[in-house]
Amino acid sequence: LTYGVSVLVISCPCALGLATPVAIMVGNGMGAKKGILFKNATALENTGKAKNIVLDKTGTITTGKPEVTDVIHTGEFTREELLETAYSLENNSEHPLAKAIVQYCEKNHIGKQEVTEFLSETGNGLRGKINDVPVAAGNIEYVKEFTKVSQKYTDDANRLAGEGKTPMYFVSDGKLAGIIAVSDTLKEDSISAVKHLKEMGLNVTMLTGDNKITAQAIAEKVGIEHVVSNVLPDVKEKVVKEQSLDGITIMVGDGINDAPALTRADVGIAIGAGTDIAIDAADIVLVKNQLEDVPKAIRLSKMVLKNIHENLFWAFIYNIIGIPLAAGLWYPFTGIRLSPMFGALAMSLSSFCVVMNALRLNLKK
């Protein structure tokens, strides 16, 4: 009876049951203090196992606050006419680049007209009518549907793109009105964050709706070799899906267009300053809007996983040694047996050790 009670007491799976949840609880608390919010335990565990990471450009690598840098009008339109067309069209869009043009025009006291039959084609451009005159704005492929673009203006756009700017073409009444270039500055910690991600052995990919030349210029500045440009929202999701086949993949973004990819990824990380849809779709939210918090989240996940393994190891060692001892299997050879009282003490100590080992995470930075 004594042996039976001792085995029953010492085999209580408290240490094993506490090994994982206590470490995860401490990890979540540490993350919250650093402005890294894990929505679920799976995200906390998978982040440290990631092999690939996909970064959206606008609002993630860059500040997401672009500004107009160049205004080039054609011979058939004045600068004011180009800006008025641009202001009227872009005022109907919520895209960050559109907001940059609107702010620029408002600052320069440019007038605007009412746009009818407005249509926004995600990833391509805008179209509508101003006083029954058809107008359009977008990338080179999109505006080719409405007008011919001479080599001179194509060269101008390529030059601007090579400087890391995003050129947008504007068409009015079937004629090219001009080009407006917008530039988004890099976040202060983007270069260091990408460097740390690569040092962790992650395959880093940048996604952007910008053209290839602009995308490559930005990628070179931050040290990213793999770039996918001219992407639409569904293409972002496809890229993430393909990378997930090669291992656990993290997607980092902040916009409405990133939501499908964030949902598709094994771990979706939303920048805190992003849209509500992106934040809802993500598994992790970075409150501080800093890209450097991504490698911090990965390091935290790795520490938690290591701690869980340590807890499970010692919990199993405790059971492997304690249960045979409580059952009296060692008594014929050593004369040692464990009373129920000491069995209860050993069980309590094992749980205490697991909890203290998990709390030890708080000592790490």
Task: Walk through the language-model features, giving the residues of each.
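Hydrophobic alpha-helical transmembrane segments
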Residues: L1-L55, V228-S229, R299, M303-K365
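Hydrophobic "anchor" residues
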Residues: L16, T60-I61, L176
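Ser/Thr-glycine-rich phosphate-binding loops at phosphate-binding pockets of nucleotides
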Residues: T20, T58-T63, T208-G209, L232
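Short hydrophobic beta/alpha edge segments that flank linear recognition/processing sites
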Residues: N28, E67-V71, A86
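Conserved ATP-binding TGD loop and adjacent catalytic N/P-domain core of P-type ATPases
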Residues: F38, A50, I130-D132, G164-T166, ...
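Asp-based phosphoryl-transfer active-site loop
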Residues: A43-D70, L262
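P-type ATPase nucleotide-binding
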Residues: I72-M200, K212, I224-V240
